[in-house]
Amino acid sequence: MITDEQLNTIALTFGFASIILIIIYHAISTNVHKLEDETPSSSFTRTNTTETTVASKKKK
């Protein structure tokens, strides 16, 4: 059988590991969102190109 001390050690280890994983996930998630905000998205470029094409056709 597992003793109370072993169970306590296992519970603390898993708790500590889960907190560390949450912190790492948050750091990665935040950095990804910042990178997405800084770089222009390809959908914006496509939309902008489409609007330019439509506008040039209307002028003719």
Curated annotation (Swiss-Prot):
Pfam families: Ost4. GO terms for biological process: protein glycosylation. Residues 1-6 are lumenal. Residues 30-60 are cytoplasmic. Residues 37-60 are annotated as: Disordered. GO terms for cellular component: endoplasmic reticulum membrane. Subunit of the oligosaccharyl transferase (OST) complex that catalyzes the initial transfer of a defined glycan (Glc(3)Man(9)GlcNAc(2) in eukaryotes) from the lipid carrier dolichol-pyrophosphate to an asparagine residue within an Asn-X-Ser/Thr consensus motif in nascent polypeptide chains, the first step in protein N-glycosylation. N-glycosylation occurs cotranslationally and the complex associates with the Sec61 complex at the channel-forming translocon complex that mediates protein translocation across the endoplasmic reticulum (ER). All subunits are required for a maximal enzyme activity. Component of the oligosaccharyltransferase (OST) complex. This is Dolichyl-diphosphooligosaccharide--protein glycosyltransferase 4 kDa subunit. The gene is OST4.
